[in-house]
Amino acid sequence: MTDTGYTEELLPGTFDALSVRENGGNTESDTSSIRKSQNQDSKQEDVHRENLSVQTLEDHTEVTETREQSVSKDLFDLPRAPASLDVKGLQESDEDHYVKDLSDYKSMDPGKPGTVPTNVSEIFNSNQPTLDEPIQFTRVSSSSVLSESISEGDADLISHLEGKVEEGNNLTSKETPGTIESIVGDKTMSTIEGSSQNIGRISTGGRMTPDLSLMGGALETSSDFLNSTQTSNSPKITTPITEVDANDVYESPLNEILSSTDSFNKASTASADHSKHVSVHEVIPEEEPHPETTNEDPPIKTPVMVNNFFENQTPVSESRSPFRTISSPFSSLRKNVKSQHGTPDHSQRNSNSSTSSNDVKRKTGTKKKGVFSTFVQNIKRNSHSEKRISSGSGNGSGNNAFKISTPYNAKHVYHVGVDSKTGEYTGLPNEWEKLLTSSGISMKEQQQHPQAVMDIVKFYQDVTENSGEEKVFKTFKVGGGSGANIASTPSFRTPSTASVQKFETPQMQTDATFPNENNDTPYSSNLQGPLLTNDFSETVNNEKFIPTRPAPKPQGSSTVSRRVEIPSPINSLGHGTPKVQRSDTQSSSIFSFKKMPTLKSEQPLPPIPKAAEKPANLLPARAAPTPPKPAIPTTPEQSSIPAIPSGLAVEVKEESNTSNVQTRKAQEKKREERKRKNQQIQSKLTEICTTGDPSKLYKNLIKIGQGASGGVYTAYELGTNASVAIKQMNLEKQPKKELIVNEILVMKGSKHNNIVNFIDSYLFRGDLWVVMEYMEGGSLTDVVTHCILTEGQIGAVSRETLKGLQFLHSKGVIHRDIKSDNILLSMNGDIKLTDFGFCAQINEVNLKRTTMVGTPYWMAPEVVSRKEYGPKVDIWSLGIMIIEMIEGEPPYLNETPLRALYLIATNGTPKLKDPGNLSHKMAMFLNWCLMVDPEDRGTAADLLEDPFITEIAEENTSLAPLVKLARMKKLAESMEDDENDEDKYDEQS
């Protein structure tokens, strides 16, 4: 070795490359010198291998000692803060500058100055390209590079010198053919790239997180680093390895070195000096990815450790924001494990590595990395406990912050459509479907008349809602000039029958103009508070009852979806004479009336008895019933206000307080107004009623009925011994006291032989006593049930009923409930109408026929269909009552109420069971009464001129035997019922 010397320069990743250096001598050219040189080369290689083994063993011993010291220290320092190093990767330069010793690479910790070898500094100062951009990483162990740079032969040699690894540092791995998927105990990953030939030819796989205090702006990435082989979208690199038998336990001699190296300890210690603590919620700046260029791939990012928590960072696609939020590492870990393996195995993770090129195959064997399993288990336990605490506190704070209340005032608006194919309704409410199903209306019938079904269901519902109300006068405008205008509110209640005890008439507009029939000068009256003023000096001169509102206008051609709003008042209550025209106004409608074409203008009105002259100074036009304003149905938008959370601003509370104050003021104002009105009504009743105790003026009071507001009694007047009916009412329980005043005034001013007349009224101890005529013969229902009437007797009943209807219609009153229950007879056969107003309901109640079950059968089609109607609805009801007298019951009585309404609306004129038994005159009269079109239907005055009334009808006295027979049969039935009840009682006792 005098002429030529060999210096071993160990290259990263190879151990057989020698660099020949000349010492200045001349080389001999003979063959012997060449052979000698070759022999020396072989000997030198042997020496080199021996030196390498010794050097590696020494390095291993030194590292082991250092590890033992660091482990003892780490036991008290756990957990440590994350390390942040600013280390530039090693790369091979074009001038072949090599690392001269593997030991030079062992320590890369900038926290220990002076320990970095000079060879490394020379490499840093070289002109070779460097990585200017800092690289994120958790820990970089020099042992990973060391294990990478050991060849197979050297690994076999060292494997004999190493014992078993401690149990706490064992590596748990999942071995599959071609890959090893492992997760280290501390949840960290290091990406190792290299080849068995030259580590300098490969870009560094692991990137280290720089010191946050030294991090500047975005730095450019080295072109050599970007040339690493990886996928641009998801750079997950798995190192192909040889298959390992799953049953074999592989123990690497470098496990101790890999698990705890000098670099590992130095990096952990230096983290306290060069990096700040990063909380889980801190945002770490992340370098912005460069746009894709030729032969350039996005950099690989290693997992980042934050506050002793480790996160497996998946490749991030290009994003506009250069920041990301660090979240819990274990949630991402579970997500990755589930997506890769299907089971949440927290002890396994892919160990990623890269290959230098497609031409070079890795020759190294399988590698495993040991970790502190107990350290990781502590982290897991602490993390789970913190999560439980945080979740519990979160729930508690959420409960204390605000509470979600349940819905209130909820309304469900239905939209009903029609199936174009089947014609069936879709979206009907359940209640309506049940009604249609239980009513017996078949699906075919629903398809044939869908609009009729909708109308009768709506009508049925409205009547049911009003079942608890009391009946009041239903009036209309009659005769006297076509230019009369009456203002009325646009919302009206649906008419009902006598059994439905409550009816509501709309309020009149405050100022309404009526024609004065004595002259053409209209006069104005205040109808808002009728009969509460002192303007009652005008004379009546045989005027009409109450020229108030006409029949209300229906909804017209409204859509199906509007018709099915539940509930809503019916706006259509009439059709026929008089004709009504409604103009569009905001709060009221103007009605113009034409003269009734069927009413004879020259026909004299029946004279008013002289007994009525005393109260005749009242103005009838002011006697319009004025109930309280009906509730306006709210739209879905106005239905309810959602609950206000407690955490809203103070302004909202102030607004709500202000609104509450305003509401209270409005309520107080209404209360005062109601009190004032009650005082006025009380004063007016005292004015019009007779003073005294009615119990001392009448004898033998027998209670025959009981209503919601009082009872009905029969008595005999002292002196005359006339039979009377007394209706007792508690004024405190009357919601419409002003209507009572109106009716008393109307009945006082009207007397007719075919009307149950008003006798007197008394106000005693807060109770109102209304005394009226009483018909001892009972109702026509008893006669129809127990007797068979002839055509002459039917004609007599029809004539007397038409006389009473003519009188009511001439006064502008629609009875609306003509049926046998409301036709009363005396023992002499006299016939009077009753139940045309609130105070007139004094007949004995028949529960079966006065409930909703018995009411719809006498109704006119225009009422059922919710169209406009007028006084001719009473004529239709008279025709149904004639059928009742012929056959003993009205049509469709055996049908359900809803189906009866449907048949009335769709069938038109009902058919008789045996029409051949009727005479021609009677059949023509009945047909005239039952015309479907109200315009073709006769009026009361016209029907009184019909031959059936003038020629066939008998005198009233012909009815007296029927009345007596009916009373006897009824008495016998009652006695039989009493005996049956006694027998049942005896059997039970």
Curated annotation (Swiss-Prot):
CDD domains: CRIB_PAK_like, STKc_PAK. One of its GO terms (biological process) is response to pheromone. One of its GO terms (molecular function) is protein serine kinase activity. ATP binds at residues 704-712, 727. InterPro entries: CRIB_dom (IPR000095), CRIB_dom_sf (IPR036936), Kinase-like_dom_sf (IPR011009), PAK3-like (IPR051931), PAK_BD (IPR033923), Prot_kinase_dom (IPR000719), Protein_kinase_ATP_BS (IPR017441), Ser/Thr_kinase_AS (IPR008271). Residues 1-78, 265-400, 567-588, 620-681 are annotated as: Disordered. The keyword Cytoplasm applies. This is Serine/threonine-protein kinase STE20.
